[in-house]
Amino acid sequence: MKIGIINTKIRTVFSAFACMIAASLVCTMPARAVVEININKGVIEPLPIAITDFLSADQLGSNITSVIAADLERSGLFAPIDKGAFIEKISNPDAAPRFEDWKVINAQALVTGRITKQPDGRLKAEFRLWDTFGGQQMIGQQFFTTPDNWRRVAHIIADAIYERLTGDKGYFDTRVVFVDESGPAQKRVKRLAIMDQDGANVRFISDGRALSLTPRFSPNWQEVTYMSFEGGSPKVYLLQLETGQRELVGNFPGMTIAPRFSPDGQKVVMSLLQDDGSANIYTMDLRNRTTTRLTSSQAIDTGASYSPDGSQIVFTSDRGGRPQLYVMGADGSNPRRISMGDGSYSTPVWSPRGDLIAFTKQSQGQFSIGVMKTDGSGERLLTSGFHNEGPTWAPNGRVLMFFRKAAGAGGPKLFTIDLTGRNERQIQTPNFASDPAWSPLLE
């Protein structure tokens, strides 16, 4: 069965940067991070960076530059300088710039580039990153792609700049799958949708005729698992994003809750509602469809998420009274409570870096998005309000996306926040949106 076919147009254009040719654009500066990211610092001073319009025969160069600048600015680590302050007009991006002109406006780094159309119709995108105070080129790269993938080129360039200046992998060349919500509150239509991480290129991947919830990416981002009430009972499906083909993962008696992939993509972990009203955590091996029960309690165990190495699982359980966070081995062994604060905890998700667990906390009439170390220590609440829920990690483990509903008759919206808790941004979507899940870096 096909639903919501997506033409990704990516595999034929990019494959792990295989189309990148950098032999003629060498890095001439020793590797070092210019921007220091310290999540305990509280306030990070953004790095002033000048991003010149890429030379091109049309508006495309300026469009690409705008996306690069928006990506970097939204991270909270960079402050793109207004183009009206530029002294030098770049006419040859291959030549060294007049560094003194850029130092005068306090540009710590400079980006120049060019877009040219090739005889075969493809685009060639080149860029260089300069250390203006050091007077040296830091990196230079070029890419080939089709014209309709220009936004993806911009995200890849922004990732390269981010990585070179921070020492961390970027997260801009990624996608987010979420639940699109439209219509009045009493008759809300919920469809699965996918978009670029900045809210562009929204595509619907379900038709809204059946309630669909909890979409989650596979580790290779080519598949999404989700729960659907098609036919009136909850079922878990696996959707191939490139073809639109889907298959039934399991048709279990009772409700199936919050399916999520293992890091190797070979299993799905989920909760199954039992006849006595309890819910326990199971895994299903996608290779042979065998299920294994991991918890056996009279409580509600749900919201399971693997550690990046696949050796542990964090989940929510009310076995001690209020919902709290627990960690156990991937085989269900040695469950132990890690959350010790007041209130209730839910929707835990392990950081891709392996160092933190994000969660939703309900306490004193507010819903907060927070993080803690994997042993439960160092709990920090990043944002609080009427209803914040459902954190998901960017693949570099530095930023979270979540959904928020304000008091009143409105609906949920998507936001991002970094680990300082100070850089919070709304992601614009066509309708109300909830339950986001961030993809790995695209390949």
From Swiss-Prot:
Cellular compartments annotated: Periplasm
Cleaved signal peptide residues: 1-33
Keywords of the record: Cell cycle, Cell division, Periplasm, Signal
Keyword match Ribonucleoprotein: no
Location, primary (coarse class): periplasm
InterPro entries from the UniProt entry: 6-blade_b-propeller_TolB-like, PD40, Tol-Pal_TolB, TolB_N
Entry's Gene Ontology cellular component terms: periplasmic space
Annotated GO biological process: cell division; protein import
HAMAP family: TolB
Subunit structure: The Tol-Pal system is composed of five core proteins: the inner membrane proteins TolA, TolQ and TolR, the periplasmic protein TolB and the outer membrane protein Pal. They form a network linking the inner and outer membranes and the peptidoglycan layer.
Family (UniProt): Belongs to the TolB family.
Record function comment: Part of the Tol-Pal system, which plays a role in outer membrane invagination during cell division and is important for maintaining outer membrane integrity.
Protein name per UniProt: Tol-Pal system protein TolB
Organism: Brucella ovis (strain ATCC 25840 / 63/290 / NCTC 10512)
